[in-house]
C-alpha cells in the first residue's frame, strides 16, 4: 500500500497544485468576472519564488506568503483598468496580460533565464505542504462563501444590474475577487516553483489556461468543491486513459462537451441542484431572487 502511494505521489502533488490554480480561477468566475489572468499571475508567483530562493536562499515558506501578497497587489492593479469592461472584453484584456507576462519571462533573460527558464530551484515543498496550503485556502473560501461577500459574489454573477440597484459596490467587489484570485494564483505558483526544480515560460501558456478553465467548468463555479472535483478530473483522467495514447485529448474534449450539455452548471453544482429539486419539487424561489434576498439581509 505504501509503495502504491509513493508510485502515485507525484500525480497527487500535481492534483493539489491544479486544485489551487482552479480555485484562483473559480473565485473571479463566481463573482461574474470573466478573467483568465490566473495563468499570468501563477507565472509571476513562480518566477518570484524561484528568483528569491536561488539568489537569497530564503525558505519557500517565507517566499510563498510574500508571493501571495505580490499576486494580491497585481490583482488589485488589474481590477482598475478592467472595471469598465465586461464579458469577452475582460477575457481579451486579461489574455493580453498573460501574453505580457509570458513575453517578460521569455525576454528578460538575465533575470528569468529566457526560453531555457530557471533550473536547480531548491525543492522545499512536500505533499504535506501542498495539502496544508490547499486546506487553508479552502477554509478561507469556504468561510467567505457563507458571508455577505459570498452572497454578493453570487448576486453579481447572476445579475449585475440587479445587484447594483441594491446598493452593492460592483467595482469594490470585483476588485476583491481579483485580489483573492491573484493571491491564490501567486501562492500556488510559488509552491509549484518550490516543488518541480525548474520552470519555463511555456509552462504558463494555453495548456494551463485551458486546464484551469476546464476544471471550473467541469466541477462548477458555485461551490468551492466544484474546482476541486474539476481539477481531479483534469489531473487523473489523462492518467487513467493513458492506454488510449494520443486519443486521451479526444476523451477530455468529449467529456467537457457532455458535461456542458447535460450538466451546464458543472458536476458538483449540477448534482447539488438535482438533489435539491428532489427534496423541494416546485416550491423554491428562483436562484436570482434567493441571492438578492440574501444580499438584502
Range-by-range predicted roles:
Residues 1-297:
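Transmembrane alpha-helices and adjacent helix-loop boundaries
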Amino acid at each position: 500500500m505504501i509503495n502504491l502511494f509513493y508510485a502515485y505521489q507525484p500525480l497527487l502533488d500535481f492534483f493539489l497544485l491544479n486544485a489551487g490554480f482552479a480555485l484562483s480561477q473559480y473565485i473571479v468566475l463566481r463573482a461574474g468576472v470573466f478573467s483568465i489572468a490566473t495563468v499570468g499571475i501563477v507565472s509571476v508567483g513562480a518566477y518570484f519564488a524561484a528568483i528569491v530562493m536561488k539568489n537569497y536562499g530564503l525558505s519557500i515558506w517565507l517566499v510563498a506568503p510574500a508571493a501571495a501578497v505580490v499576486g494580491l497587489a497585481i490583482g488589485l492593479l488589474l481590477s482598475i483598468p478592467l472595471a469598465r469592461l465586461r464579458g469577452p472584453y475582460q477575457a481579451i484584456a486579461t489574455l493580453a496580460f498573460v501574453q505580457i507576462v509570458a513575453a517578460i519571462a521569455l525576454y528578460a533573460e538575465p533575470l528569468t533565464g529566457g526560453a531555457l527558464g530557471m533550473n536547480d530551484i531548491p525543492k522545499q515543498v512536500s505533499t504535506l505542504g501542498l495539502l496544508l496550503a490547499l486546506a487553508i485556502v479552502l477554509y478561507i473560501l469556504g468561510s467567505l462563501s457563507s458571508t455577505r461577500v459570498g452572497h454578493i459574489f453570487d448576486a453579481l454573477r447572476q445579475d449585475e444590474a440587479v445587484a447594483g440597484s441594491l446598493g452593492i459596490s460592483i467595482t469594490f467587489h470585483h476588485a476583491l475577487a481579483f485580489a483573492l484570485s491573484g493571491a491564490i494564483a501567486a501562492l500556488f505558483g510559488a509552491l509549484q516553483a518550490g516543488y518541480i526544480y525548474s520552470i519555463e515560460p511555456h509552462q504558463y501558456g494555453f495548456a494551463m489556461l485551458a486546464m484551469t478553465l476546464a476544471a471550473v467548468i467541469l466541477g462548477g463555479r458555485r461551490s468551492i468543491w466544484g474546482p476541486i472535483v474539476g481539477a481531479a478530473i483534469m489531473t487523473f483522467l489523462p492518467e487513467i486513459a493513458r492506454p488510449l495514447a494520443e486519443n486521451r485529448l479526444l476523451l477530455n474534449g468529449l467529456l467537457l462537451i457532455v458535461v456542458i450539455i447535460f450538466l451546464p452548471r458543472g458536476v458538483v453544482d449540477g448534482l447539488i441542484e438535482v438533489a435539491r429539486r428532489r427534496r423541494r419539487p416546485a416550491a423554491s424561489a428562483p436562484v436570482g431572487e434567493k441571492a438578492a434576498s440574501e444580499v438584502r439581509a
